[in-house]
Amino acid sequence: MRDLILGGARSGKSRLAERLAAESGLAVSYIATAQAGDGEMGRRIAEHRARRPAHWRTLEEPLALAATLRSEAEAGRCLLVDCLTLWLTNLLLCDDPQRLDGEREALLECLGELPGRIILVSNETGLGVVPLGELSRRYVDEAGWLHQAIAERCERVTFTVAGLPMPLKGEPL
């Protein structure tokens, strides 16, 4: 089962993903893509860590997501990735278009092949106005294209608003 959970900042998407992982009854590997570039992000990361059960395996991978998924995925394991848009940001800031393209394609290729349960969390960025800056516009565009491609490969897609899951594809939660 592959789940994509979308939502805005502080929408409850991570809590929902963590709940689904815990309820799966499987061993959980939590793949964190965030990097603590400043104090505020460091506090967010600490908040997420504090919420996770101690027995969950945590891996921090800001760039090579597909390789990490391939190495961790197995029947009887749940992989929770939080989050795709931070991973995308990390790749955009690498300023290496070939790396971005390669990592994105590797992720899309491996999703259909992975055994076990996969839960992907991402920020929906396309509901606001078109950003003024070139990099910001590219980020919103890349996130939108990535979400479409991943949603196509997932059995269930859920949009989270105010802590409430709204089904977009597949069985409602």
Curated annotation (Swiss-Prot):
The keyword Amino-acid biosynthesis does not apply. GO terms for biological process: cobalamin biosynthetic process. CDD domains: CobU. The active site is at H48. Pathway: Cofactor biosynthesis; adenosylcobalamin biosynthesis; adenosylcobalamin from cob(II)yrinate a,c-diamide: step 5/7; Cofactor biosynthesis; adenosylcobalamin biosynthesis; adenosylcobalamin from cob(II)yrinate a,c-diamide: step 6/7. InterPro entries: CobU/CobP, P-loop_NTPase. GTP binds at residues 7-14, 32-34, 49-52, 60, 82. It catalyses: adenosylcob(III)inamide + GTP = adenosylcob(III)inamide phosphate + GDP + H(+); adenosylcob(III)inamide + ATP = adenosylcob(III)inamide phosphate + ADP + H(+); adenosylcob(III)inamide phosphate + GTP + H(+) = adenosylcob(III)inamide-GDP + diphosphate. It holds the Pfam family CobU. GO terms for molecular function: adenosylcobinamide kinase activity; ATP binding; cobinamide phosphate guanylyltransferase activity; GTP binding. It comes from the Bacteria. Keywords: ATP-binding, Cobalamin biosynthesis, GTP-binding, Kinase, Nucleotide-binding, Transferase. Its EC number is 2.7.1.156, 2.7.7.62. PANTHER family: BIFUNCTIONAL ADENOSYLCOBALAMIN BIOSYNTHESIS PROTEIN COBU (PTHR34848:SF1), PTHR34848. Homodimer. Catalyzes ATP-dependent phosphorylation of adenosylcobinamide and addition of GMP to adenosylcobinamide phosphate. Belongs to the CobU/CobP family. This is Bifunctional adenosylcobalamin biosynthesis protein CobP. It comes from Pseudomonas aeruginosa (strain ATCC 15692 / DSM 22644 / CIP 104116 / JCM 14847 / LMG 12228 / 1C / PRS 101 / PAO1). The gene is cobP.
